[in-house]
């Protein structure tokens, strides 16, 4: 099998596990892809790119619209009648992308928010999608911490076959229970998790 949208390579994991043969390559590739999707789930975002995608959003208010992670924007349109027809095309001078300077918390981030400027406002209509954004979604490159977390998680998933039912024996220490998410992996991906308000 080939890895689809993996955040590390097969060779990265083989190097980490000190594996030089190709006997388990299919299982290792499965571990990489599974680890990558688990990281997506934990972070509530994807780091791979989808080019030329059209997505629709509900603005937070008349001036702010949160969007999926964007590497580049081709067009922004709004539906003035909230009827699914996106009839108002915005110029790049009609909105500001955030985070400012592409940095959030000291980390390079893609665009996650559009703020209206000048004379345009985002139409609000009872929670309906009134904003259409066409562009390249995802991240320009996989963050180093995400790549390393994927290597660790892929290795862990692969080694689970040697660890029955989440319990591992360690020499003189005895038996230890394997936790749900490795604290090191959690610490690596924490800055990239979307924060949700209830």
PLM features per residue range, with description:
Residues 1-198:
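Divalent metal-cofactor coordination and adjacent catalytic microenvironments
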